[in-house]
Amino acid sequence: MSITPWTRGRILGGFGGPRLLFGRMYEDHGIELGVLPASPSRVLCIASAGDTAAALHQAGHDVTAVDINPVQLAYARTRLSGGASVEGAAETLMRLGRGAAGTLLPGWREDALGAFLTLDDPARQVRCWRGDLDGPGLRRLMRWSLRPGGALAMALLPSFASVVPARFDEVFRQRLERTVARHPNVRNPWLWRLFVGAEQPGAVPVHAPDVRLVQGDVVDVLERAPRGGYDAVTLSNVLDGPGPAFAGQLRAAVRHAVRPGGIVVLRSFREPGPAGAGWAAQDRSALWGVVRVVRLGANPDGTNDRRIDP
């Protein structure tokens, strides 16, 4: 097994075994649906709460969903079979943040946010964001909770705290504005999850009981797969937390398991480097600093891989 902090099944400090980390997913699977080969393709994804696996399966793909956390995988199985969503560690953090904002800031109370979330004009959304939501009170609250040494950094395990941008209070506000300036709120289920912790009205429940679920380290699963056995992999943010050794193992495993010409999708919470943010602005979830899409070439050293830009 490769070395990754995801093995613990925890993102928050404390004692005990694996916990449920994600009750819902915060990744816009519209990215994957737009770049993956035509269905039916053989796709491996991270199971998490099951949303991406369900969307890919419903689009006609042959989906294998992998998770190293047995608690998370059991939850994904239940949810994909029609079970209800429940709160994981990520939702607990978000609920506490929303509660503080709603108590201190009138614009962040649920009734006011409900009106904001029904808007369908990005230009108006930006005006409302700047005028009603992104004020001095929010900036003070985010500065207290999201900067280095703040509440979020103290709650997270060190491996995960290390990937949070140094000025995440400013970075997160910028990512939120980028999202509302580009995507209609009324058609953005991920913004509803972030702002009010609920599905938007009329949302279709997750349901894909035929998704193949595998418990294990994604590197091990890819290494055991037939060479070129997948047309695409979408790996969430599995590189957020582990060190360079894990990244190297994952790179080699992907090259083994994905055919030349196949697609790889990776996300990261980090701020983008010189290579840019990729598809992050197109991801309606608002969380990601980088969303990278790559088409694998035939050369084992990666020299003819091709980055796919929006």
Task: Please give the residue ranges for each predicted region.
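A short glycine-rich, Lys/Arg-flanked "PGG" loop and its adjoining helix->strand segment in the class I
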Residues: 248-260
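Core SAM-dependent methyltransferase catalytic element
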Residues: 280-310
